[in-house]
């Protein structure tokens, strides 16, 4: 699933490890999501959206 996590992280000066710690997953999980190798669970998608104060639909594009 396409996403703009790298851009959102960069805007906040966050590393993958920083984001992973903030949402309670491993850095490898964030890396896999960013590279479109893993689709996050609904719970994780909500946690990511909350971290960036946006809607899930604004962050993830299923196309």
Roles of regions detected by a PLM:
Residues 18, 29, 58:
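Residues in the helix-turn-helix
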Residues 25-38:
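Recognition helix of helix-turn-helix/homeodomain-like DNA-binding domains
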Residues 3-22:
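Short basic helix-loop element that most often maps to the first helix and adjoining turn
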Residues 59-63:
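Short amphipathic recognition helices of helix-turn-helix/homeodomain-type DNA-binding modules
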Residues 43-58:
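DNA major-groove recognition helix of helix-turn-helix/homeodomain DNA-binding modules
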């Amino acid at each position: 699933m396409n996403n703009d996590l790298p851009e959102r992280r960069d805007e906040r000066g966050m590393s993958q490890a920083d984001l992973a710690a903030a949402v309670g997953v491993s850095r490898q999980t964030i890396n896999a999501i960013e590279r479109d190798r893993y689709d996050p669970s609904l719970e994780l998608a909500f946690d990511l959206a909350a971290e960036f104060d946006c809607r899930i639909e604004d962050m993830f594009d299923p196309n």
